[in-house]
UniProtKB/Swiss-Prot annotation:
Belongs to the ABC transporter superfamily. ABCF family. YheS subfamily. Pfam families: ABC_tran, ABC_tran_Xtn. ATP 1 binds at G34, K35, N36, G37, C38, G39, K40, S41. Residues 2-246, 313-531 form the ABC transporter domain. NCBIfam families: PRK10636.1. This is Probable ATP-binding protein YheS. InterPro entries: AAA+_ATPase, ABC_tran_Xtn, ABC_transporter-like_ATP-bd, ABC_transporter-like_CS, ABCF_EF3_subfamily, P-loop_NTPase. ATP 2 binds at G349, K350, N351, G352, A353, G354, K355, S356. It comes from Haemophilus influenzae (strain ATCC 51907 / DSM 11121 / KW20 / Rd). The lineage of its organism: Bacteria, Pseudomonadati, Pseudomonadota, Gammaproteobacteria, Pasteurellales. Keywords: ATP-binding, Nucleotide-binding, Repeat. Residues 547-558 have a biased composition (Basic and acidic residues). It comes from the Bacteria.
Amino acid sequence: MIIFSNLSLKRGQTELLENASATINPKQKVGLVGKNGCGKSSLFALLKKELMPEGGEVNYPANWRVSWVNQETPALDISAIDYVIQGDREYCRLQQKLERANERNDGNAIARIHGQLETLDAWTIQSRAASLLHGLGFSQEETIQPVKAFSGGWRMRLNLAQALLCPSDLLLLDEPTNHLDLDAVIWLERWLVQYQGTLVLISHDRDFLDPIVTKILHIENQKLNEYTGDYSSFEVQRATKLAQQTAMYRQQQQKISHLQKYIDRFKAKATKAKQAQSRMKALERMELIAPAYVDNPFTFEFRPPQSLPNPLVMIEQASAGYGIGESAVEILSKIKLNLVPGSRIGLLGKNGAGKSTLIKLLAGELTALSGTVQLAKGVQLGYFAQHQLDTLRADESALWHMQKLAPEQTEQQVRDYLGSFAFHGDKVNQAVKSFSGGEKARLVLALIVWQRPNLLLLDEPTNHLDLDMRQALTEALVDYEGSLVVVSHDRHLLRNTVEEFYLVHDKKVEEFKGDLEDYQKWLSEQNSTSENKVSEKVGDNENSVQNRKEQKRREAELRQQTAPLRKKITQLEEKMNKFSSELANIENQLADTELYNAENKEKLTALLAQQVDVKKALDDVETEWMTAQEELEEMLQA
């Protein structure tokens, strides 16, 4: 049992918790939720014993094994699977003892250690690690590649696999779905449902929380508020609680009335039975929980587009990929897709199948290798992808960005608009380089929404966003009148905002006749088929020499095609190492206590400014590196 007793916790001068108490029972699975900055990660630090409370206590059994996801992954030469196995610290300790016992030829010690390894189920550790990696999206070949060969997002998956492999009584997961695609999210959800220990989970993905947790701890007003049930149950309970506060009643009714009008309109035009039924349930649920978000700090909406050409986009027999001429690598082939006003499409498919490639083709970032992509005259594009965050001017403010976009607006009008995205007061004048990932994402969305797009392309728009902002974005998209294409691992957003799904697989883009539950079944079938094919391949020796020759030829061709991109990645890695060394040097200097004496004020100020600049440069290079790695992954899987 975990007992928080009269807990008080500060971050700097900010009071996070004050006399807060709560209890988590053994083997209970708890969702820890609350607004950004409320103290969720600090509570994790308390549980990991990295932080001490200002007052009160946190108690749990001293013999509990605690596992969590490391945030750093060094560029190691060891294989992915060996790195994951290092997560089982007791296994590694016993292996080291066994090596020493073998060196001494100590038969008694060897026998004793083998017995301890047997208790740990050590002989299956390779297969268990491989199973975790497969579930998180690694191919069999990738499990033996060195850790340093993977991009930042994939290294975070390795850290997650490490934490899952480690035997634990208490598992702490802070936003584990952040670097995952939908397939891996679904797999992780199933794994956590089966987990036998106590779980405390921070997540902004309500559809991920629901099947897993049986209790919610909500940090609000410096207290730990306990709710029994899953996240959906918490929303209803909190909505009921807030509805009893009469001062909010009128706002709640306006919100409910607004959603009801949309539901009525959707009923009148729903055509695709399965998807329509699924979306209707989702929208009706949004109406039910609307009062829980009446205090949401985000209040923006999409204004009607100035024009709605029909069709907006026509794609005929187009192929898409990377490179030019003979060196081009085709990712998608013979795409046929028409987007009209009111099209609401969610893209499904495994990681590397080409979902982002299709979005880039629609956005004009990629030119079709063959076929045609025709945008109508008057298309106003709104395009959100993670690399769009880097188009922001680091030294300029949110106010500056908006004034550049809307010079005819007064400063107060711009401030009011930015306020609907929770940029208030002095925040609008702060340089973007000081913003968190979530704040940058909000600013990019603010710029997009202002332009009244009639074609909206969203590639993982909820990364970095908290639950309130995700809810606000979902509500805004419900009312959006243009054409929408979205890639997201947030199933709540998909259920509420799209009316049809397209499946991207085997170089094809095809309509998927079903809902997200049907997609989960399709994934399970695909995974079973893949495993069977591997088994058949192992047993089939016919023409093996010819097959190996053909495989070597293809590998050589692919190496040649990807050589420029690999060179770029190597150069970016060198830059990353350079900036990391610079940052480490600065932080070593900042650790010197004498630096904070009054006479060193000028030096301290210069070092802090330098730290900000180097961090920004490192972030920019890492983002560019991850984009290049994604392109390489898609080329390798083509």
